[in-house]
Amino acid sequence: MSSGNAKIGYPAPNFKATAVMPDGQFRDICLSEYRGKYVVFFFYPLDFTFVCPTEIIAFSDRAEEFKKLNCQVIGASVDSHFCHLAWINTPKKQGGLGPMNIPLVSDPKRTIAQDYGVLKADEGISFRGLFIIDDKGILRQITINDLPVGRSVDEILRLVQAFQFTDKHGEVCPAGWKPGSDTIKPDVQKSKEYFSKQK
């Protein structure tokens, strides 16, 4: 795994790359064009594999939930945009993706994967890296899974909601926090309000 330039609390590495857009067209996109929105940027190893379609379809199927949070989901792999399109055009029952509601970025030179520290150099593919970037372009969360285990869309939604809550209210979110749950005031005395309610 490469060390990369992605660091929590710092601007996420910008990129410009060709993506297959939800309308099936090719378009060059930049991370910077999403400034003002949260971004969930995730890498997956390869098109036409086994765990990858389950993750990508899960994110695509719930793209509207992210959109309601002013959050754009973007997927990326080292495959060409032509390969992405072929996979999208392959029926789900044959291991394909079917129509997508999120852009899929092509990183054939592996520069984006390297920049984000997810390149598995010995195989020339990406680990399952996921990055939550806030509306100011600051990297707020990083997870990197080894190849055989997929990610939870529910957990990513929860994290976006939690970061947005802390941005807006200045309170912090305890373990397992969900919208509507109690939060903690980050103050020695005021935090006792939360802890006094615990069993």
Curated annotation (Swiss-Prot):
The modification N6-acetyllysine is found at K7, K16, K136, K197. Residues 176-199 are annotated as: Disordered. There is a cross-link at K185 (Glycyl lysine isopeptide (Lys-Gly) (interchain with G-Cter in SUMO1)). Residues 6-165 form the Thioredoxin domain. The modification Phosphothreonine is found at T90. There is a cross-link at K7, K120 (Glycyl lysine isopeptide (Lys-Gly) (interchain with G-Cter in SUMO2)). Its EC number is 1.11.1.24. PROSITE patterns: THIOREDOXIN_2. Phosphorylated on Thr-90 during the M-phase, which leads to a decrease in enzymatic activity. Induction: Up-regulated upon exposure to arsenate. The keyword Iron-sulfur does not apply. It comes from the Eukaryota. Keywords: Acetylation, Antioxidant, Cytoplasm, Disulfide bond, Isopeptide bond, Oxidoreductase, Peroxidase, Phosphoprotein, Redox-active center, Ubl conjugation. SUPFAM superfamilies: Thioredoxin-like. Residues 184-199 have a biased composition (Basic and acidic residues). GO terms for molecular function: thioredoxin peroxidase activity. It is found in: Cytoplasm. The modification Phosphoserine is found at S32. Its main location: cytoplasm. GO terms for cellular component: cytosol. The active site is at C52 (cysteine sulfenic acid (-soh) intermediate). The modification N-acetylserine is found at S2. Pfam families: 1-cysPrx_C, AhpC-TSA. The active site is a conserved redox-active cysteine residue, the peroxidatic cysteine (C(P)), which makes the nucleophilic attack on the peroxide substrate. The peroxide oxidizes the C(P)-SH to cysteine sulfenic acid (C(P)-SOH), which then reacts with another cysteine residue, the resolving cysteine (C(R)), to form a disulfide bridge. The disulfide is subsequently reduced by an appropriate electron donor to complete the catalytic cycle. In this typical 2-Cys peroxiredoxin, C(R) is provided by the other dimeric subunit to form an intersubunit disulfide. Belongs to the peroxiredoxin family. AhpC/Prx1 subfamily. This is Peroxiredoxin-1. It comes from Cricetulus griseus (Chinese hamster).
